[in-house]
């Protein structure tokens, strides 16, 4: 019988997800600084906590912390999926697809519940695409790290 957390998969998922969250954060911040997008990761992360992210250093720090927490949560979910459901074959592709699944959930089904600003969701192709690509990168990075942390492995007991 497979059991989750036999080999520390929970905490490894937390670590992988938080680190991959930093990768996603960096990607979205770069796009925002370059003027490709209007909204940065703080806008999406803080949308879960409050209706609108206020300007300032405090909001930036809180947004970064929220990104780590959200990344850690999804990292545990992805770790669980790879431990119980998916095989190790093509783990990067599967991680990418799981990231796209997160995008569909967060910005399709739960966008209103998370309080994302309408102008973010209607901000044009660049905005929506950058969020999609950011979460695809997040999923791939999480899978990559889970492989390095030996959560994703060829044989299961």
What are these regions (language model features)?
Residues 1-157:
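Juxtamembrane/disordered regions of integral membrane proteins
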């Amino acid at each position: 019988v497979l059991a989750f957390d036999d080999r520390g998969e929970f905490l490894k998922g937390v670590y992988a997800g938080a680190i991959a969250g930093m990768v996603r954060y960096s990607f979205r911040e770069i796009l925002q600084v370059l003027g490709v997008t209007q909204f940065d990761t703080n806008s999406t992360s803080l949308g879960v906590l409050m209706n609108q992210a206020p300007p300032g250093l405090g909001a930036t720090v809180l947004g970064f912390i929220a990104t780590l927490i959200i990344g850690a949560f999804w990292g545990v979910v992805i770790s669980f999926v790879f431990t119980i459901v998916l095989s190790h074959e093509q783990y990067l592709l599967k991680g990418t697809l799981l990231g796209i699944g997160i995008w569909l959930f967060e910005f399709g089904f739960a966008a209103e519940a998370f309080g994302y600003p309408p102008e973010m969701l209607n901000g044009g192709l660049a905005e929506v695409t950058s969020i999609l690509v950011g979460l695809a990168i997040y999923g791939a990075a999480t899978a990559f790290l889970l492989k390095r942390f030996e959560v994703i492995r060829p044989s299961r007991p």
